[in-house]
């Protein structure tokens, strides 16, 4: 198996284990990022596990930190959510080192949710505290998570896409080579995740959910996010993003993007 496949496989196992751990304390975290996209379109998976939730007077972070201390994780500075807690676990198979699975955790209270290009524009994780904007997902009968409904998750991924592109544009010249390449790879994955959420007929999924354009329109209006939607038009022209969707043609993605804006305008 390729390194990414090994890491994604291990990451998914860790995700299920972490969610089961939370269930022992009667807690259900909210899953965002690549594994949240996997719920709606299981095309790729993720290396990172991204979780958010209420602080609950420190219980949320304490729960995940206890898990990580007892499961071979080491604390690192997060390059993902950029918040309180990030830990990574080295992955070996047959004595070969493949890389790390990273777990990034953020509380609703700590997250500001500002766009990097304009701090006055915000899309906070606290929106996931609204039961009308998330759904409870059962992964295997023992592992549960809340996942943002497809329109909200789409906006979170769109924000990540724009934030990382902005960081590359404004700070890429002073980044180290590895950091810059990591950021470019993340931008590609964000773009691929956006396409995955636009796909009206995914081949595989955990939960089938129709894209609610009325909810998307409401979120965009409530948070003044129309400026960000232009990035969706870029997706069909990003070759490396399209390469992550084997068998899907550029014209198909163009049709999905056109349909997206047509339905949003109704």
Predicted regions and their residues:
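Compositionally biased terminal segments of proteins
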Residues: 1-266
């Amino acid at each position: 198996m390729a390194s990414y496949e090994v890491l994604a496989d291990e990451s998914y196992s860790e995700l299920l284990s972490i969610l089961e751990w939370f269930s022992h304390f009667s807690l259900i975290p909210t899953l965002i990022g690549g594994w949240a996209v996997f719920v709606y379109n299981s095309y790729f998976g993720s290396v990172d596990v991204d979780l958010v939730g209420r602080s609950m007077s420190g219980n949320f972070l304490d729960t995940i930190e206890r898990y990580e201390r007892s499961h071979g994780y080491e604390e690192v500075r997060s390059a993902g959510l950029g918040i309180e807690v990030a830990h990574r676990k080295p992955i070996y198979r047959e004595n070969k080192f493949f890389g790390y699975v990273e777990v990034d955790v953020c509380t609703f209270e700590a997250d500001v949710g500002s766009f990097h290009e304009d701090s006055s524009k915000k899309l906070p994780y606290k929106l996931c505290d609204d039961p009308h904007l998330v759904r409870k997902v059962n992964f295997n009968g023992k592992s549960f998570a809340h996942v943002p409904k497809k329109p909200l998750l789409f906006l979170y991924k769109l924000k990540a896409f724009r934030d990382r592109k902005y960081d590359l544009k404004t700070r890429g010249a002073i980044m180290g080579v590895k950091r810059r390449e990591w950021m470019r790879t993340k931008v590609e994955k964000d773009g691929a995740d956006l396409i995955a959420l636009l796909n009206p007929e995914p081949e595989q999924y955990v939960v089938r959910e129709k894209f609610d354009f009325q909810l998307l329109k409401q979120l965009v209006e409530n948070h003044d996010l129309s400026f960000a939607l232009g990035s969706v038009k870029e997706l069909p022209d990003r070759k490396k993003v399209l390469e992550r969707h084997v068998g899907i043609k550029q014209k198909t993605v163009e049709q999905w993007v056109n349909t997206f804006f047509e339905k949003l305008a109704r």
